[in-house]
Amino acid sequence: MQRINREESFRAKEERLKDLFVRGLSGNNAAYQTFLGELSSYLRAFLRKRLIRLPDEVEDLVQEALLAVHNQRHTYDPSQPLSAWVQAIARYKLVDLFRRRAIYEQRNDTLDDGMDLFSSADAEAAEARRDLNKLLADLPDHFRLPIMHTKLEGLSVREAADVSGMSESAIKVGVHRGLKALAAKIRGAL
């Protein structure tokens, strides 16, 4: 019995909204304003059920759906139930919201997810620095200093010569022979 009352109540609301909407389409501004007010309550309830975990999005989505109903009012077929047409529009707006959120979340991963990437990159860089320092420590100064100044510190050959007190050609030869010695040492370690 209670179910019958609910169905009758729903049908009565459906007919009332439909009547207001059709009168509004005919130019009755007061009926259209009343329709939009009552429809917003209907949409709010409809969307609140579907956005339990996103309650902050309900009002924005109600406004988007109302705007879509207004913009698409010319597509409504009066021989069809108004609620089905409105719910279809609201569902499309709901899907749009979920797509926007998915794209946003995909583009904006939380920092916690990326912290492992940064920490492993830092750890790998520290290991590489340590290994390189061990390799360079075994080289004589006339090989080690030119490599450190030009390859690690980014100095030009002239700047490296000024800093180390060596000639520019000695810097070039030192870098070449030092890298060759490092390559041989690494090959021997493998």
UniProtKB/Swiss-Prot annotation:
Gene3D superfamilies: 1.10.1740.10, Winged helix-like DNA-binding domain superfamily/Winged helix DNA-binding domain. Residues 130-182 are annotated as: Sigma-70 factor domain-4. Disruption phenotype: Growth inhibited by 100 uM chlorite during aerobic log-phase growth, no expression of the SigF regulon (Dsui_0156 to Dsui_0159). Growth of a double sigF-yedY2 mutant is completely inhibited by 20 mM chlorite. Induction: Part of the SigF regulon, induced by chlorite under auto-control. Part of the probable sigF-nrsF operon. InterPro entries: RNA_pol_sigma-70-like, RNA_pol_sigma-70_dom, RNA_pol_sigma70_r2, RNA_pol_sigma70_r4_t2, RNA_pol_sigma_r2, RNA_pol_sigma_r3/r4-like, WH-like_DNA-bd_sf. The keyword DNA repair does not apply. Residues 157-176 bind DNA. A motif (Polymerase core binding) lies at residues 60-73. The keyword rRNA-binding does not apply. GO terms for biological process: DNA-templated transcription initiation. One of its GO terms (cellular component) is cytoplasm. Disulfide bonds: none annotated. One of its GO terms (molecular function) is DNA binding. Residues 34-102 are annotated as: Sigma-70 factor domain-2. Keywords: Cytoplasm, DNA-binding, Sigma factor, Stress response, Transcription, Transcription regulation. Pfam families: Sigma70_r2, Sigma70_r4_2. It is found in: Cytoplasm. Belongs to the sigma-70 factor family. ECF subfamily. Sigma factors are initiation factors that promote the attachment of RNA polymerase to specific initiation sites and are then released. Extracytoplasmic function (ECF) sigma factors are held in an inactive form by a cognate anti-sigma factor (NrsF in this case) until they are released. Regulates expression of only a few genes (Dsui_0154 to Dsui_0159) in response to (hypo)chlorite, conferring resistance to reactive chlorine species (RCS) during oxic growth. Interacts transiently with the RNA polymerase catalytic core formed by RpoA, RpoB, RpoC and RpoZ (2 alpha, 1 beta, 1 beta' and 1 omega subunit) to form the RNA polymerase holoenzyme that can initiate transcription. This is ECF RNA polymerase sigma factor SigF. It comes from Azospira oryzae (strain ATCC BAA-33 / DSM 13638 / PS). The lineage of its organism: Bacteria, Pseudomonadati, Pseudomonadota, Betaproteobacteria, Rhodocyclales. The gene is sigF.
